Amino acid sequence: RAAVAADRGIIGGYGLGAPYGLAGGYGLEVPYGLAGYADYRYPAGACGIDAYGGIGEGNVAVAGELPVAGTTAVAGQVPIMGAVKFGGDVCAAGSVSIAGKCACGCGDYGYGYGLGAPYLY
């Protein structure tokens, strides 16, 4: 368990967390990663959601389930390894990329087998 939270473990500075992992400044997150927001110019109040107004920064590491009831607004990136299931509408401004096969059958080229190729939306 100590390796999970340690400096060089799964969540530490050289694992999945900041500053050099998947969620760090040089990984999938801003400003240099795949999900950089510099070119998207998100407008204030996008999707009917206004700015938070508070100041703060933090990391959330979840092993297992994270049930959320209500509305959750995220400004930034949410790197996910595994599966995600949404029930209802998902408001997204910017781009969404899916690497792998999704259950919607997209990319099955009309054969209906759901054997979709990797897609980038």
Swiss-Prot record:
Species per Swiss-Prot/TrEMBL record: Lymantria dispar (Gypsy moth)
Q: Name a single GO cellular component.
A: egg chorion
Question: What Pfam families does the record point to?
Answer: Chorion_1 (PF01723)
The family annotation for this protein states: Belongs to the chorion protein family.
Q: Give the Gene Ontology MF terms in alphabetical order.
A: structural constituent of egg chorion
Summarizing the function annotation, the protein's role is: This protein is one of many from the eggshell of the gypsy moth.
Which UniProt keywords are listed?
Answer: Repeat
Keyword Repeat in record: yes
Q: What is the official name of this protein in its record? A: Chorion class A proteins Ld9
What are its GO biological-process terms?
A: chorion-containing eggshell formation
